[in-house]
Amino acid sequence: MTARPSSLAIALSCAAALLVPPVAVAGAAQLEEVAQPAGTVGFIVVRENGSGSASAAQSYLDALLTSLAKRAGWPAASGKYFTKRSKAKKFIEETKPSFGFFSFGAYLGMRKANGLTAMGVADANATGGAQYFVISKSAFTLDACKGKTLASNHADDARFVDVVVSGDAFDLADFELVETKRPVQTVKAVINGEAECALIDDAQISTLATIDGGAAVHPVWASEAMPAVIIASFGSAPAEQVDTFAKHLEALCEGDGKGACDAAGLTAPRKVEADAFAAQQAAYDG
């Protein structure tokens, strides 16, 4: 091939180097030319607004997929970690993964376009997305926040917030929205008086005690609990791969996979019925 490899091809080739024997690689300079083993099963992770390092999360994913491939009898499994749906979309189009790990909003938002079917759920310690809260320093009820400034880094998908997170308790349009980019920035907006209230998740509320001024902030509303991680198959996934993954899904964090799950905070993967989230899907789809 004479064309210069794309940055995506280089990244995938580097990941493949973790999954093939060292004898297949002649040197670091040749990593970009190493092809994925035939039969490699593709994965993607889309964890929106997750805390922690994306590069660390990628290393945990690589280790977990290496363990899964061994357990499932696949030649290899590889995947990529994303924090934005927009960036994940290009990867999906180019690599056509079979499976994914999604935050709940990402799953609902990407489900129809990709033919996603829920296979399981998992807990994710301290990574957020399992419950949402409205917090304030001055207000003591949700109604007292309405019409006031509301900071949030969870407002990218207003539909998810309005029809799933809020449970019809509010719409983002009920507030003067102050969009933030980072989890801690959202909390500090309330502490510093830049916003009257804020919409945060369980990971953010757990950090209040560690942030200067956080003790003065309190929740005025809490959502219902929801799955932190949805494990799903893509519509294009071969049936044989789906059946094999289903057999090993609940053992993801056992054996060689335990260390990667522990490091990533992933716990208790368990199967669900394909229609487990039918109500939320119907609400989101309108």
What are these regions (language model features)?
Residues 9-22:
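Bacterial N-terminal signal peptides
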Residues 21-30:
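Signal peptide processing junction and immediate N-terminal pro/mature segment
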Residues 31-108:
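Extracytoplasmic small-molecule ligand-binding "clamshell" domains
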Residues 36-50, 124-134, 213-253, 259-286:
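Periplasmic-binding protein-like
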Residues 46-70, 105, 128-188, 192, ...:
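Bilobed "Venus flytrap"/periplasmic-binding protein-like clamshell domains
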Residues 79-90, 176-188, 225-227:
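Short helix-initiation/N-cap motifs at beta->coil->alpha
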Residues 82, 87-145, 156-158:
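Acidic, polar ligand-binding/catalytic clefts
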Residues 101-114, 191-219:
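A ligand-binding cleft/hinge motif common to bilobed small-molecule-binding domains
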